Amino acid sequence: MIGMPPPHFSLERQILSYYESGQEAERLESPFFRWEKVRTLDLLERLLPPAPALILDVGGAAGAYAFPLAEKGYVVDLIDPVPSHIEQAQKRAAMGQRVPRSFHVGDARAIPCDNGVADAVLFFGPLYHLTDSGERMKAICEARRVLRAGGVLLAVAISRFASALDGITRGLIRDPDFVRIVQQDLKTGQHRNETGNLDYFTTAFFHHPDELKTELIEGGFPNPRLCAIEGPLWALPESATAEQQEGFMAIMRKLENEVTLIGASAHIMGIATKPND
């Protein structure tokens, strides 16, 4: 149950400007990034409890995953800190039938929901846009609060090595300004783009895989496991037949839990279950 409006939190200006520009919707539909969405949907199908479980999609943008889940019979509450994302989702919902139950402007650090009601919480954004570790811990503890015992948190991080690998794959590494961004990413995990080039992303924190696991444990989720989302698939050519794509997916399912390869994935999913207290 969605409750009273939470305390006010604000996104950093650069992050809000990036998403208000419509970059996220365009990115997920672009050929180069398609594997992120395809693989995420594949993982959700395998990791979520059966419908009609209640899912809180926190930081879910305009509903890239909330709508497909609602179509499968899940009860989905979509929460995002970017007002235009919620407006886009509401417009889309007006044209559909099986759509998310509710849409709210809100923040992962103060989820507008009662204690212990959610079967699953999706964090597909909050952990990399909360650049301070204390703020990330607030969000993780909030996820634990709203989950029922046995509920699952699926929390996505961007890999510490994502910019370096992206730069090599797409040739961005030829730009000295991009090289400087990569150097800071590798040193501190703090991704800062002062170039004005939106292709270089926006303000974020890039996790080392071990950091993601540690944060989940410290937030009250014992024994989390990590899973590579795209893995090496993001380096594949843009065109592939349906048969080839299925072959790629079968390989990735074999590689997704390989510890030595998880950091080579642009996105890493932390899978954590709330214990019985």
Question: What are the residue ranges of the model-derived segments?
Answer:
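Conserved class I S-adenosyl-L-methionine
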Residues: 2-51, 64, 68, 96, 152-185
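Class I SAM-dependent methyltransferase SAM/SAH-binding core
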Residues: 56, 64-110
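A short acidic, Gly/Pro-enriched loop at the edge of an enzyme's catalytic core
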Residues: 109-121
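A short SAM/SAH-binding and catalytic strip from SAM-dependent methyltransferases
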Residues: 119-134
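A short glycine-rich, Lys/Arg-flanked "PGG" loop and its adjoining helix->strand segment in the class I
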Residues: 137-149
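C-terminal lobe and adjacent flexible extensions of AdoMet/dcAdoMet transferase-like proteins
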Residues: 215, 219-277
